[in-house]
């Protein structure tokens, strides 16, 4: 088995769906197109392997899918907790000003005044819009009451520019927010 070099973690199996071996996947993105369109998923449970994805659909914000060789609820439940990876080359093309969340993680965040706020550690969806989770750098005399993390809405009002080449996001966000 040749493992693709461009695998990207896109979600995890949260449990079984129904009685016929379907699995429920919690995507790590608001847009699950990559999961829905990939014909092969790479799972890390019970061992790292590729599995053919036979069919899938969105259900209550998750992806439910039928995987080759997973027959029955018990087999699907045994995959609970497995991470799902797919090759980056299988991701659908994006339009201008669209980004995959995985590409934003690790970018530096600074405000319009040029103050470094931290680094994107994760993204989450609050139902209304995505949110940048920014890990705040701690000084040597760290104030125990100081914020460890900033939550910045990922909307045009606050996110001014995203420069993937410079690995930087500029936001309209004050230090006192």
Curated annotation (Swiss-Prot):
GO molecular function: ribosome binding
GO cellular component, as recorded: cytoplasm; ribosome
Disulfide bonds: none
Compartment(s): Cytoplasm
Keyword Ligase listed: no
Biological process per Gene Ontology, one example term: ribosomal small subunit biogenesis
PRC barrel domain ranges (all copies): 96-177
Pfam families the record matches: PRC_RimM, RimM
Keywords: Chaperone, Cytoplasm, Ribosome biogenesis, rRNA processing
Entry keyword annotation includes Hydrolase: no
InterPro entries referenced in this protein's UniProt entry, alphabetically: PRC_barrel-like_sf (IPR011033), PRC_RimM (IPR056792), RimM (IPR011961), RimM_N (IPR002676), RimM_N_sf (IPR036976), Transl_B-barrel_sf (IPR009000)
Family of the protein in this entry: Belongs to the RimM family.
Free-text function comment from the UniProt entry: An accessory protein needed during the final step in the assembly of 30S ribosomal subunit, possibly for assembly of the head region. Essential for efficient processing of 16S rRNA. May be needed both before and after RbfA during the maturation of 16S rRNA. It has affinity for free ribosomal 30S subunits but not for 70S ribosomes.
Subunit structure: Binds ribosomal protein uS19.
Domain notes: The PRC barrel domain binds ribosomal protein uS19.
Protein name from the UniProt record: Ribosome maturation factor RimM
Biological source species: Herminiimonas arsenicoxydans
Name of the gene this protein is made from: rimM
């Amino acid at each position: 088995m040749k493992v693709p070099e461009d695998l990207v973690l896109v979600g995890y199996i949260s449990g079984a769906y129904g009685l016929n071996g379907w699995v429920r996947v919690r995507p790590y993105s608001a847009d699950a197109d990559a999961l829905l369109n990939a014909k092969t998923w790479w799972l890390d449970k019970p061992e790292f392997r590729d599995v053919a994805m036979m069919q899938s659909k969105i259900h209550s914000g998750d992806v439910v899918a039928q995987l080759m060789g997973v027959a029955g609820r018990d087999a699907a439940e045994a995959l609970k907790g497995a991470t799902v990876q797919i090759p980056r080359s299988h991701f659908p093309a994006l339009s201008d000003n669209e980004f995959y969340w995985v590409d934003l993680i690790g970018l530096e965040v600074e405000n319009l005044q040029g103050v470094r706020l931290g680094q994107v550690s994760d993204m989450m969806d609050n139902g209304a819009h995505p949110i940048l989770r920014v890990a705040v750098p701690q000084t040597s005399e760290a104030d125990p009451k100081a914020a460890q993390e900033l939550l910045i809405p990922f909307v045009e009002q606050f996110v001014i520019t995203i420069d993937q080449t410079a690995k930087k996001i500029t936001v309209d966000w004050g230090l006192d927010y």
